[in-house]
Amino acid sequence: MGDPRRLSKTYDTPNHPWIGERIKQERELSNKYGLSNKKEIWKMETRLRTFRRQARKLISDTSAQGEKEAVQLFGILNRYGILLKEDATLDDVLSLNLESILERRLQTLVFRKGLANTPKQARQFIVHGHIAVNGKKINAPSYLVPLVEEDAISYMPNSPMASESHPERTDSVKDAE
């Protein structure tokens, strides 16, 4: 089978490890979104950085190919619900912040939909296999949910959480059903 290739990191670490303000901001984000470690923040920052880098490159590119790439970038950002403006510009891409990407994670959406009481509980439900998207079990809390799949987030049908009488189910979900 051969040796698997060495996978490259999907994130960049901070340049300086002990900047108090950055540590404080990361702790607040970690608590707000129920993240388990700083690496999850760094992965999303890197993803945001690539979008912004591409937008900066496209601002200076006035060719037809640059126009096509800008339309593709807007398509990706619209598909994931990160940038929802119809008449978005590349300046709007540059003004995106980390929270706009963190809001599209499966863990955050499970909590926002009321399927879990806290972001940490949402993470636990996802990791333990209680959450499905379009009927398919997703066990990665960092899964970026496209807009078309957002309404299809639910409990797995064969999960104990699917039972209305389960003690861990939230009151808002019991009332909705």
Curated annotation (Swiss-Prot):
Residues covered by the S4 RNA-binding domain: 104-168
GO molecular function: rRNA binding; structural constituent of ribosome
Region Disordered: start-end pairs: 157-177
Ranges annotated as biased composition (Basic and acidic residues): 165-177
InterPro entries for this protein: Ribosomal_uS4, Ribosomal_uS4_arc, Ribosomal_uS4_CS, Ribosomal_uS4_euk/arc, Ribosomal_uS4_N, S4_RNA-bd, S4_RNA-bd_sf
GO cellular component: small ribosomal subunit
Keywords, comma-separated and alphabetical: Ribonucleoprotein, Ribosomal protein, RNA-binding, rRNA-binding
Signal peptide as annotated in the record: none
Any one GO BP annotation for this protein: translation
Top-rank taxon: Archaea
Any one Pfam family match given in the protein's UniProt record, by short name: S4
NCBIfam families per record: PRK04051.1 (NF003139), uS4_arch (TIGR01018)
HAMAP family per the UniProt record, alphabetical: Ribosomal_uS4_A
Described function: One of the primary rRNA binding proteins, it binds directly to 16S rRNA where it nucleates assembly of the body of the 30S subunit.
Family: Belongs to the universal ribosomal protein uS4 family.
PANTHER family in UniProt: 30S 40S RIBOSOMAL PROTEIN (PTHR11831), 40S RIBOSOMAL PROTEIN S9 (PTHR11831:SF5)
Subunit: Part of the 30S ribosomal subunit. Contacts protein S5. The interaction surface between S4 and S5 is involved in control of translational fidelity.
UniProt protein name: Small ribosomal subunit protein uS4
